[in-house]
Every structure is written in C-alpha cells, then in structure tokens.
C-alpha cells in the first residue's frame, strides 16, 4: 500500500512525522459458523489492511486523523476520559487504549493518522485490522512489545465487546495479529491452539466477489445458535460429555433426531459436516490438492444455503456462476445473508469468470459487484 498520502496528511496535520504500522484484514477459507460451536476455523491474513502513522506527543491527549472518513475525520480525546468518544470509529482506538491500560501498560498521549484498503462491508474485518494496528503500535511504543500476540488479539476482541457493542469471536483479530505469508491458520476455537498450513496455490488466485447486498439478520443468527444448542442439550442428556457440537458425532445426532425439528436437525448436521470438511482441507493443502480444497468449498456453500439456510439468492447466483465457469471452489464467506463469496480460481479462467460474474449479476440484480483479488500475507507489524 502506498503510504505517500498518509505521510503527507500526517505532516500537514501534526507538523512532524511518526512511525508506520500495518495490520491486515482476513479471509476465512472454510469453517463457517463453527466458532460458537467449539469447532475449527481456517483464516489467513491478506495483503489489504490498515496502515497507521503514530507519534508520541508527551501529553494525555490522543489526536486522531481518519483519512478515509468524510464526516468528522479529526477527533481528540483524553486518556483520562471515562466516556468513550461519540464517533464510532474512534471507539475502537479508545477501547484499545483502555484494554492495554487494564493489562498494566502506561499508555501516553499520541498523534495518529490511519488509512486502509480493506473494503468496508466486504467481510474482511476492517475493524479487527484497525484494533490490531493500534494495539500492536501502542504495545511497541509504550510497553516495548511485552504484551504477547495472544493478548493483543484478545485486546481487539475485548474492544469490540466492551466499547463497540459487538459480541464477536476471536478469529478476526487472531488472523490479523498471527497472519503469516503463504500460510493459513487452523484455529481451534475452544482451546485457541493453532497450526499453520501452507497455502501457496501456484496457478490459482483467491478472488472475492462482493454481492453489494446485506439482508437484515433480524433474529436469524440467534435462531441458528439455538438450534445447535437444542441438539447439544439432547445429546448431552442421552450420552453425557457433549458441551458443544464439537463433542458430537453423526450417530449421536441420529439418536436424538426425533426430538428435533427438521430445521434444528439439518443445522446441527451442517456443523458436523463442516468439522470434517475443515480437517479434509487441511490434509488436502498438505498434499497440494487444491482441486479437493475447491470441492469442499462448494460443499460448504450448499450446506450453508440448504441446511444452515444463511445464504441468499444473490450469493447462490454468484456461486452457480462460478460453477458454470469452471471455478475450482466458491462459497459465501462470513455470517451470510449478503457480503462476499470467496473463490479459488485457476489463472486460466479468472478473467472469463470475473467479467461474466459482473455482467450476469448486474443484468439480474441491477448492481455491479465489486471484485477483489487477495494474497495471503503477514500479520501486524512495524513498517520500515
């Protein structure tokens, strides 16, 4: 990412220059709706993210310039303020400061400007990138980096919970902090144990297509979580030792099927299927079998669409278009009901696929979808 504009705006605003830090957005190749079921997710950091320029100012004041924000891009707050800032974007930074202070870091005042190339609303977690960039920078500046990476990821999650009203899991922040070039991370959402797997798809590209729609979730998320919890309760009562669907198997689920609605049963079965798919994809990557990876991505999409019912016509249309174009793998990425599809595409069909997807989607829905090609990159870091 070119930092010239950031450098110039910082110097114009604050009359000096600072240090540069970067934290990436993320993709999740497979492992969807598994986090709150104690399962595995399989994210990776991408080459798009948030870049921060920052300089200690020797006071208790924090002075912020959000270059990409049109309405009220400049804001100040005191580290002694007990109330979070009014601007939503500043709450992320205020929260990171407060969470670092809870962990014994003596955060001082600073001037900062930031910009990013993570498309907002595309499901690549721009908010986690922002939290991680400031957590990494402030930890380096005021604590000589003594707060470890696990804790930095937890600081981002706690910021969402305590200052932004979002009860998220830890995957987004974890991927942003722990990302490694050429690798995906299999993260165990129960134990937070993790393992890197090589992702170097020679002859393939990772392409995200933004449907540009976001249907209201309403109570949909809670309904699906409740379905999983009903199945867990029945299996635990009958077999014992079932705390989440991670602890269950197909035989257990079949044994309690009569006590579940059809929707509840299919949703629980999807989670069991997805657990197996994540493990299969890890093995396929170790063997360099990207065709099998793609096959499992399609299976995940149609499981999310037909069993977990979190897709929508627009996303199904994009995945069907991918299949017709011979794309290796495609699925909805994220919570569903809109957002992006993630596609594993051979170089030889990429241009044909993206042009057809844009043309056919615009013809059907009257919206031109945005397309982003991403590369798996490193996590939070100081830039030279």
Task: Explain the meaning of each model-derived region.
Residues 1-21, 27-30, 36-40, 77-79, ...:
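Gly/Ser-rich oxyanion-binding loop with an adjacent helix/lid
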Residues 38-45, 224-225:
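Short Gly/aromatic-enriched secondary-structure transition segments
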Residues 129, 340-344:
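FabD-like malonyl-/acyl-CoA
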Residues 43-45, 53-56, 87, 104:
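Short, charge-rich binding segments
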Residues 1-26, 51-86, 183-329, 344-384:
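C-terminal nucleotide
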Residues 337:
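Glycine-rich phosphate-binding loop
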């Amino acid at each position: 990412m070119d930092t010239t504009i950031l450098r110039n705006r910082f110097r114009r605003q604050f009359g000096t220059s600072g240090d540069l830090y970067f934290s990436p957005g993320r993709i999740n190749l497979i492992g969807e709706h598994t986090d709150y079921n104690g399962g595995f997710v399989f994210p990776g950091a991408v080459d798009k993210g948030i870049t921060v320029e920052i300089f200690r100012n020797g006071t208790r004041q924090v002075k912020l310039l959000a270059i990409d924000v049109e309405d009220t891009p400049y804001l100040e707050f005191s580290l002694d303020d007990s109330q979070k800032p009014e601007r939503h974007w500043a709450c992320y930074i205020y929260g990171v400061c407060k969470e670092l202070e809870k962990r014994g870091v003596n955060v001082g005042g600073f001037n900062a400007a930031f910009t990013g190339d993570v498309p907002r609303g595309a499901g690549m977690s721009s908010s986690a990138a922002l939290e991680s960039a400031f957590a990494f920078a402030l930890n380096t500046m005021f604590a000589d980096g003594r707060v470890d990476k696990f804790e930095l990821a937890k600081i981002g999650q706690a910021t969402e919970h305590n200052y932004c009203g979002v009860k998220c899991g830890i995957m987004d922040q974890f991927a942003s902090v722990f990302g490694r070039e050429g690798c995906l991370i299999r993260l165990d959402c129960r134990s937070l144990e993790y393992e890197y797997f090589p992702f170097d798809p020679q002859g393939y590209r990772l392409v995200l297509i933004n449907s540009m729609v976001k249907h209201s979730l309403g109570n949909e998320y809670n309904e699906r979580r409740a379905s999983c919890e009903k199945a867990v309760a029945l299996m635990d009562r009958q077999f014992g030792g079932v705390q989440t669907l991670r602890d269950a198997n197909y035989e257990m689920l079949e044994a309690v099927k009569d006590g579940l609605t059809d929707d509840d049963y299919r949703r629980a079965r999807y989670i069991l299927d997805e657990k197996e798919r994540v493990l299969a994809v890890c093995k396929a990557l170790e063997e360099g079998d990207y065709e099998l990876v793609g096959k499992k991505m399609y299976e995940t999409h149609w499981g999310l669409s037909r069993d977990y019912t979190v897709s929508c016509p627009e996303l199904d249309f994009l995945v069907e278009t991918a299949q017709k174009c011979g794309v290796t793998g495609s699925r909805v990425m994220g919570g569903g009901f809109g957002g992006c599809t993630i596609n594993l595409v051979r170089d030889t069909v990429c241009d044909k696929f993206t042009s057809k997807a844009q043309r056919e989607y615009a013809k059907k829905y009257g919206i031109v979808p945005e397309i982003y090609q991403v590369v798996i990159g490193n996590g939070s870091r100081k830039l030279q």
